[in-house]
Amino acid sequence: MEKQRREESSFQQPPWIPQTPMKPFSPICPYTVEDQYHSSQLEERRFVGNKDMSGLDHLSFGDLLALANTASLIFSGQTPIPTRNTEVMQKGTEEVESLSSVSNNVAEQILKTPEKPKRKKHRPKVRREAKPKREPKPRAPRKSVVTDGQESKTPKRKYVRKKVEVSKDQDATPVESSAAVETSTRPKRLCRRVLDFEAENGENQTNGDIREAGEMESALQEKQLDSGNQELKDCLLSAPSTPKRKRSQGKRKGVQPKKNGSNLEEVDISMAQAAKRRQGPTCCDMNLSGIQYDEQCDYQKMHWLYSPNLQQGGMRYDAICSKVFSGQQHNYVSAFHATCYSSTSQLSANRVLTVEERREGIFQGRQESELNVLSDKIDTPIKKKTTGHARFRNLSSMNKLVEVPEHLTSGYCSKPQQNNKILVDTRVTVSKKKPTKSEKSQTKQKNLLPNLCRFPPSFTGLSPDELWKRRNSIETISELLRLLDINREHSETALVPYTMNSQIVLFGGGAGAIVPVTPVKKPRPRPKVDLDDETDRVWKLLLENINSEGVDGSDEQKAKWWEEERNVFRGRADSFIARMHLVQGDRRFTPWKGSVVDSVVGVFLTQNVSDHLSSSAFMSLASQFPVPFVPSSNFDAGTSSMPSIQITYLDSEETMSSPPDHNHSSVTLKNTQPDEEKDYVPSNETSRSSSEIAISAHESVDKTTDSKEYVDSDRKGSSVEVDKTDEKCRVLNLFPSEDSALTCQHSMVSDAPQNTERAGSSSEIDLEGEYRTSFMKLLQGVQVSLEDSNQVSPNMSPGDCSSEIKGFQSMKEPTKSSVDSSEPGCCSQQDGDVLSCQKPTLKEKGKKVLKEEKKAFDWDCLRREAQARAGIREKTRSTMDTVDWKAIRAADVKEVAETIKSRGMNHKLAERIQGFLDRLVNDHGSIDLEWLRDVPPDKAKEYLLSFNGLGLKSVECVRLLTLHHLAFPVDTNVGRIAVRLGWVPLQPLPESLQLHLLEMYPMLESIQKYLWPRLCKLDQKTLYELHYQMITFGKVFCTKSKPNCNACPMKGECRHFASAFASARLALPSTEKGMGTPDKNPLPLHLPEPFQREQGSEVVQHSEPAKKVTCCEPIIEEPASPEPETAEVSIADIEEAFFEDPEEIPTIRLNMDAFTSNLKKIMEHNKELQDGNMSSALVALTAETASLPMPKLKNISQLRTEHRVYELPDEHPLLAQLEKREPDDPCSYLLAIWTPGETADSIQPSVSTCIFQANGMLCDEETCFSCNSIKETRSQIVRGTILIPCRTAMRGSFPLNGTYFQVNEVFADHASSLNPINVPRELIWELPRRTVYFGTSVPTIFKGLSTEKIQACFWKGYVCVRGFDRKTRGPKPLIARLHFPASKLKGQQANLA
């Protein structure tokens, strides 16, 4: 209804065209910028009206029309007008001429035909063409009824389009007291519901001022309209105006006033409605009262030039725009040309003022520091977001965008009369169509670029002189430059065009200069393992239970396929072990001492670093927090506080205790029969469940070097007999030891123990179906409830700790279970029932479930059950801690981090280690994990994975090397070797990437997923040796970068070597200059043996079809290699070959054995030689020493330093003050002789000579190096450094069974390295000599060595990478005399230069 009233009222009178010139009066907005800037200081505003209407008699209708427009703009805000001085109103006398020209333009614009509006796509309307048009009926104005401070609103009227009807005979309708006069200068148009943002204008008023303003306004309007505006009724348009809906009083209560309390008048300009209809001249972009001022220079120097960088209230331009205009609207405000619709039909609730009132300074209260254009309202669409530009109903909200300092506006206000002409002009662009991408980008660029960079439309077509006059002055530009501050903007909210190439960053972590960013090089894609569905299925079954039914295949065909696959990998493992055994030495299983806690902390330290760094870090912990050393005599058989069964092993010092299940019965283990041939578990043979319980112990093994037998209990096993008066139990099934949870290693009792090999035996109790927990579901956080408490499900959740005992068959009545039923959360059942500790089921919520599940599960239930079943394990010499873990737990984390600082990541690892120890104390009451040896493998894996920082590889290392479970950890060395040898198939590589150019290898989890289903049937000893040989092979031969392929014993089967060899053949030969210079790359690849070459060519042929399919390369014809030409020997050469020169010295070839024996006889019978100086006599003890020159004591190279050392026997007098060598240590104590004249810091021997030596004499000065060297050479005493075997230095205890070290690794005694000991020559004269390779790490020592030298080093030599302090038992760096790294040598030479 309201729309209908507005439509009808707008057509009551035809538009009046003013014909007479207008008298001078101020424009719509006659106040200056300076007045706006100071308006916030006013605290009182009131309206001063002029009741004398005689001043309007001389005005024409056009003047009255303009005056009415001005009055309507003033009173539309419904706020009191403050009293101002009359200075500003006198500035508008020069505007009459411009307004007269405007009135003529208005007449022309009104008579034009309006354009048809564009129909909205989202809301189509049906046009009724055939319906007759209705004549508009004049209607009396309707007073708005105000109830409770709210104006009643008219209902919505149906939308009907009407054409313009002009009637000149209609009279003007008087304006009611509730609304001001509204005149219509446009044809009839549609009325739409609009939003009233009057609340924004109310921010300048307090709630009390707003209520008083409404009352004063209502009373004042009634009084003045009754008395003073009667003369205007005959002149104005008779079209009634629909009063604008007023905001309710309740909405005004939430308006926040400004601090200065000033009121802000509003002018409602319905620009959005005009933009929608696009009705020609009435909606054109024209400022009817100020368009003539657009071309003025001062108008174009307005303060919007400062808008990009100025702020108000802590908000930037961009932030305010995004806040005021919702959605993605692009608000483009142009300060040079805009629209201002002054149609009287769009003005509501207006009042009329006289010219005298205007001249008295009514508008002087408009001094604002912002762009207060005409109103404070912005119309933004709510129902639908648009990407077009926002429509401004009233532009005074742009006040928030600009803030102008007072001293900057003074330059523009130097001419008051000229500055009065300046009006704020705002362009509002309305998008008709959906903007394209190019338009969007252009709009964004316009919004980002400052207005200072744009030229107004009025500048186009002007001469250079005009442009020169209109440009900014030099003073203005200099002032702008002076005020320019890079810190003015907020960097967090700054909008800048982003391009990767022009990005800049702070160098040096924010403390350095701003430099262009260096784009990160995109890494090459990581290759992936070609996994089949069957492998993935078996992998999942193995995670749940190693003895699952489908592990060997779901049908006969799959079972046969798996048997063939496992036979292939068994052959590969045997072949690899055999070859590496010949080169890298004997690395079969020999037990080390150490606790489970040591190994868990050891895997923390070995993550992502080399072994020599991680081993040094653990040695530092043992040195800083040592355990009090207890002699071995104090470690007798461990006892338990409760009555227990003594399980005795032959030739063993260790005993275990278990609860009195069978009344103090004894268990005797019988010896196993030796088996010369290794036996593997067949794929069709029933293997032991992963939940079996095995009682075992570690024992010392007598090591020999001649025997190569493997004694195993795979086939025959060992029997367990339990003698008891009440009942007798026997073991139903004996299972192979390679699947046992814990393996017992024993020595065979023989008459010749030094000729025997290790014999394995185990005592096992079959407890099937226990702890069958899905490991995958633990990782995925899925909880599976138990189906039956008496039936163990393979999907048992980790919240259920159960064990099913059905391995014993009682000959008599069963006895009571030893499990204490009073333990919380545990229940005891007999005859195969489940011992369970059930926890409430958790909901599935991703990662959060994992944390809740770990907290909810009682891991101590595993310990209680293991101790109830196998007894409490006491600390023995074999299971004693290497480090005082209680002291580490109580120490400061910074102290622990400082101890392992050399390893790297010290702070993070120190926190993890202390967190691990804290959890052990909180969960179990003590730092002890020996009970984990009696826990089933699957449960042990789940428990270890629950610790923070332990992954699958780390857990598998602990299980295989410490707990002796069936596992095969895949680290970086194992994964790289498996890929290069072709054990793991890869998905097709990109065309440009070859196998030998791989920088990244597949994920280790995927490699293990492929290998483990094929290696799961191997025994534990084979898996241990295979793992140990592979990680050593990765350090010595198959390094990540520049592997030693020439010396590799596996190059005939290596795909990496085949790819590199094929690439080297196709490569162009190097230049002669390049051939003469030393190459930093590895040695050139030698041709393999004939059979190896065929295998390598097959690999290349297999890889070619894939390339032919995807790669199209030009055919390159390679010429055949020329055949070697046979040298023709001339007749003269043949004759000269048999010509003998009588003056030539003949070469005498001696029999060295006979020569040695004769030399010994001469020395024995000829006593005269012994009377002289024996040190200068030539003594040849063997044929080898007689035929070869004496080797040097020290051979220095860049990567390694070779030292000739003497091997000291255990009974040597030099070892009287040292610790006794461990019986299982394969290495001996060594003595490294110093070169005469050498010092601890000397790198190369001195070549200087003394002046006394020219006369055959030696000086007595102690500082003379040359003379002292000669004296030491002739003396009977030499200096030396003791080298300690690594196993003896660590007292046989180290994490992960000592796999950190090499089997032939020694440590240099730090004390004798600094101060060498004096050794008589007679004590070392007949000792065997060995070679020790000193270096920084094992890979650098063996880099570039031949196969023969590597083999000699492992079998007859030793390696040394660190020193050892015998007092603190901590690691030390090697002194310069033993080895000086090439990197430090280069730095030292550079410093000297």
UniProtKB/Swiss-Prot annotation:
Biased composition (Low complexity): 98-108, 687-698
A Pfam family reported for this protein in Swiss-Prot or TrEMBL: Perm-CXXC
A biological-process GO annotation: defense response to fungus
Cofactor: [4Fe-4S] cluster
Enzyme class: lyase
Region named Disordered: 1-25, 98-186, 237-265, 653-722, 789-830
Cofactor note: Binds 1 [4Fe-4S] cluster. The cluster does not appear to play a role in catalysis, but is probably involved in the proper positioning of the enzyme along the DNA strand.
Main subcellular location: nucleus
Protein name from the UniProt record: DNA glycosylase/AP lyase ROS1
Species this chain originates from: Arabidopsis thaliana
Highest classification ranks of the organism: Eukaryota, Viridiplantae, Streptophyta, Embryophyta, Tracheophyta
